[in-house]
């Protein structure tokens, strides 16, 4: 699932099928796809996510049926397929929150050594609860977006004052992102069983860290300017 646009179009929803994108707004106009409240003509999937898990599952089943070999809708669907080489991809969601979890044992130990010089140290609560912090939702961008080298305060261990400088230790981590597609009610916990039905999908993402800026800004409240 994604959002795409050709030069003459506004961004709207589509589904990648091999080397093509199925234009969902066009498929609706052709009469082969329902879901009038899904907002496929919009530049995000948020309207569709609000339909809930049952609609998500039904839509996926409908897609599989429509795209099966010798589908009766083949003649109507063919004009709705756009070559991937002809489109630009856009951020598929309006993201209000981005929580970054600290869930890899090896990564946690490596960062501990980087920041504190202690090899293999895990925080005492690490094995007992998911550790996370509010990251920068405003810095989420699609693949291929140019990344500027960050500027910030950097303090070397052997000097008293920080300097303003370009980052020299820009790090990135391949991560798995889970998209929460359902709203929660403040003050009401979500069970493990309920949580599974609230996940709309998964994405791969790169978490960028300006390590030399982060080591100075990290204490005592955690990363801020140094993360994207």
Identify the role of each PLM range.
Residues 2, 12-15, 81, 201, ...:
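Glycine-centered structural positions embedded in regular secondary structure
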Residues 23, 40-55, 83, 182, ...:
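General structural signal for secondary-structure boundaries
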Residues 2-72:
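Gly/serine-rich nucleotide phosphate-binding loop at the start of the catalytic core
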């Amino acid at each position: 699932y994604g959002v795409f646009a050709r030069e003459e179009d506004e961004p709207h929803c589509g589904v990648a099928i091999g080397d093509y994108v199925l234009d969902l707004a066009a498929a609706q106009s052709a009469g082969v796809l329902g879901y009038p409240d899904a907002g496929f003509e919009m530049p995000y999937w948020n309207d569709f996510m609000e339909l809930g898990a049952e609609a998500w599952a039904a839509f996926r089943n409908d897609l599989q049926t429509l795209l099966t070999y010798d589908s009766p809708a083949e003649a109507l669907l063919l004009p709705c397929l756009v070559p991937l080489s002809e489109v630009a991809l856009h951020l598929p969601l309006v993201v209000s929150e981005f929580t970054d979890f600290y869930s890899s044992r090896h990564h946690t130990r490596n960062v501990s050594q980087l920041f504190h010089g202690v090899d293999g140290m895990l925080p005492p609560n690490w094995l007992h609860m998911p550790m996370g912090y509010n990251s920068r939702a405003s810095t989420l961008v699609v693949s291929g977006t140019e990344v500027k080298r960050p500027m910030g305060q950097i303090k070397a261990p052997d000097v008293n004052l920080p300097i303003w400088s370009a980052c020299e230790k820009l790090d990135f981590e391949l991560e798995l992102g889970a998209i929460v597609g359902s709203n929660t009610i403040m003050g009401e916990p979500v069970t493990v069983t309920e949580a599974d039905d609230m996940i709309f999908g998964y994405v791969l993402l790169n978490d960028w860290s300006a390590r030399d800026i982060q080591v100075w800004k990290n204490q005592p409240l955690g990363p801020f300017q140094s993360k994207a």
